[in-house]
């Protein structure tokens, strides 16, 4: 366990959550929202200000791994046990019986089930809605089933509420009413959605269409944030980070059980070979190809480059990153061709960085929301900095030069040269307890691959 030293902006989050019972925290990825929120909960439990368990609503991956892992990381959170309520109905019911846990996590898809099964015995005093934009579609009538179920207990049975997101209004101000209702039951933005739109929007009837759209009135962009300001903490990374250095963020994902079994079988073969004879330096990386492919999510099944998908854990993680980016274009580094095929299928609006010069132009003009690039195609002289400041490593490989080159394409120096006063975020999607972690170690230490593999073998 590590010793937690809050950064200045994390102190702001902690104090905000302690001071205001129902509130919003708007802060981007990499700003430590999870650790700060757990720290605030720890303070509330220690002081006796909170005695009931807490429920965290989150996407599946975040509920399953992010919150439990964060609690295990820091020594000051040793008294907080995080229990995910995931899996089969039987597993979820068993999880609810954990009397030692003070924090429970559940994915949004299981909200209706949870509210139904608990009924009048609802035990949670605090709800934390992670990636709270999932609540934007709530309406008092004709809303989604999940938010409707949540609305039944949000104000009647819950006395503390936190909306966490880096992008509160990815599609415009219309996204705010549903989230805000869970904080104050419509006190600030209107008791109903119609009241909200009538006050701050004008309806535009489209010629020849039966439906219309809303456009915010001129004063809406000022008045709506102002109306929420007393219960909202909004943090901009550019105000807190040194924009001269990239901000690295590791996003761990768990391999599903079947994928883990497949991975262990392939890893065992590699380590047997390592134990039988010394692998030459040039051959060491090649021996890890299949294992790293499994960590990424698919594997070639024959010599014709046909492939089989093993899991989609990294796809889910990338979805969260894209949602958190709030419309800011994202550059995604992949390694395997099957990575690219899976990415293009999962994100139809994404585009591969090909040889067509128009692709590069469109990216730098903000016309491509997701650009998939192999690091080998991002050598010297390629300018990607105008298109965005977010880079995601979807899969991992040993080549340090290629790794450094793609970072440099949108890195702080390029951003400054182009006149962009903004930090660069680099997200590494890493499969836990796999060679992904060893590749990450090589990037940090620049040690020989075969030495790192031998060390990894000894740890097993």
From Swiss-Prot:
InterPro entries: Helicase_ATP-bd, P-loop_NTPase, SNF2-like_sf, SNF2_N. Residues 14-186 form the Helicase ATP-binding domain. Coiled coil: none annotated. GO terms for molecular function: ATP binding. Transmembrane segments: none annotated. Signal peptide: none annotated. It holds the Pfam family SNF2-rel_dom. PANTHER family: SNF2/RAD54 HELICASE FAMILY. This is Putative protein p41. It comes from Acyrthosiphon pisum secondary endosymbiont phage 1 (Bacteriophage APSE-1). The gene is 41.
């Amino acid at each position: 366990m590590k010793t937690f030293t809050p950064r200045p902006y994390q102190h702001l989050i902690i104090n905000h959550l302690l001071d205001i019972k129902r509130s919003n925290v708007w802060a981007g990825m990499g700003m430590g929202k999870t650790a700060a929120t757990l720290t605030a909960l720890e303070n509330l439990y220690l002081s006796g200000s909170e005695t009931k368990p807490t429920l965290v609503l989150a996407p599946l991956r975040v509920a399953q791994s992010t919150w439990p892992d964060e609690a295990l990381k820091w020594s000051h959170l040793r008294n907080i046990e995080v229990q995910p309520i995931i899996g089969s109905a039987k597993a979820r019911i068993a999880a609810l019986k954990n009397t030692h846990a003070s924090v429970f996590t559940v994915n949004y898809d299981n909200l209706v089930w949870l509210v139904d099964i608990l009924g009048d015995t609802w035990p949670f005093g605090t709800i934390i809605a992670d990636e709270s934009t999932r609540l934007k579609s709530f309406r008092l009538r004709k809303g989604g089933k999940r938010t409707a179920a949540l609305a039944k207990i949000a104000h009647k049975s819950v006395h503390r509420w936190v909306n966490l997101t880096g992008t509160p209004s990815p599609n415009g101000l219309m996204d705010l009413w549903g989230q805000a209702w869970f904080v104050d039951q419509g006190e600030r933005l209107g008791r109903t959605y119609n009241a909200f739109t009538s006050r701050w929007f004008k309806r535009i009837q489209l010629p020849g269409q039966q439906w219309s759209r809303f456009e915010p009135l001129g004063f809406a962009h000022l008045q709506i944030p102002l109306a929420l300001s007393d219960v909202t903490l909004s943090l901009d990374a550019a105000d807190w980070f040194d924009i001269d250095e990239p901000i690295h963020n590791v996003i761990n994902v768990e391999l599903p059980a079947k994928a883990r079994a497949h991975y262990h079988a392939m890893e065992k073969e590699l380590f047997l070979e390592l134990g039988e004879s010394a692998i030459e330096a040039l051959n060491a990386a090649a021996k890890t190809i299949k294992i790293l492919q499994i960590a990424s999510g698919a594997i070639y099944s024959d010599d014709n480059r046909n492939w089989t998908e093993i899991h989609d854990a990294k796809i889910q993680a990338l979805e969260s990153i894209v949602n958190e980016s709030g419309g800011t274009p994202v550059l995604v580094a992949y390694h395997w061709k099957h990575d690219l095929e899976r990415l293009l299928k999962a994100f139809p609006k994404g585009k591969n960085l090909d040889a067509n010069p128009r692709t590069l132009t469109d990216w730098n003009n903000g016309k491509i929301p997701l650009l998939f690039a192999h690091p080998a195609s991002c050598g010297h002289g390629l300018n990607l900095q105008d298109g965005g400041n977010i880079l995601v490593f979807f899969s991992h490989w040993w080549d340090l030069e290629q790794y450094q080159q793609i970072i440099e394409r949108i890195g702080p120096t390029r951003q400054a040269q182009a006149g962009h006063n903004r930090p660069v975020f680099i997200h590494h999607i890493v499969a836990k307890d796999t060679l992904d972690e060893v590749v990450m170690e090589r990037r940090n230490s620049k040690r020989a691959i075969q030495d790192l593999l031998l060390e990894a073998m000894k740890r097993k």
